[in-house]
């Protein structure tokens, strides 16, 4: 990251607002202030404040806490690298990520091909860029851009025989739809792009489609 001009920073772990991801936070209490606080579920907000404050490239490697399920892919406490860069878009970020992952694999393992649960995973860039909208339609037959509210999306999912759980927001329900019908089919490295604004409210809108 330093080679690309990024500055490593540290941001608060105890936060007053648990934001930056769709996840349930761990809650704690600050005795001196007599107020509830949360263990961060992401570093996004503070890193973006630094970008607004004039630091053009920042990143943090830190602990993240999410009070949710525990399985092969999820842990309530984990380490994450998150970065932000001014004057760049998601194309620049994707190039940076695939370069970093493939370079690390080569330096650590001596190869960009790894075995994961018996399947050969090829980390060689470039990775496919997949439209989220198209992948959801392929996986479920649902056009989420035609479902303007929570209940219409819930109705479409039930008609397709899909579990809607107890989601109370349109974005949360779509996230479940993606998890159930798209993610299980993605075995090789790729990028899902063009999420709806409801799922990425702090991201810049797509210049070609303001819904994304």
Predicted regions and their residues:
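Class II aminoacyl-tRNA synthetase catalytic cores and aaRS-like
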Residues: 2-212
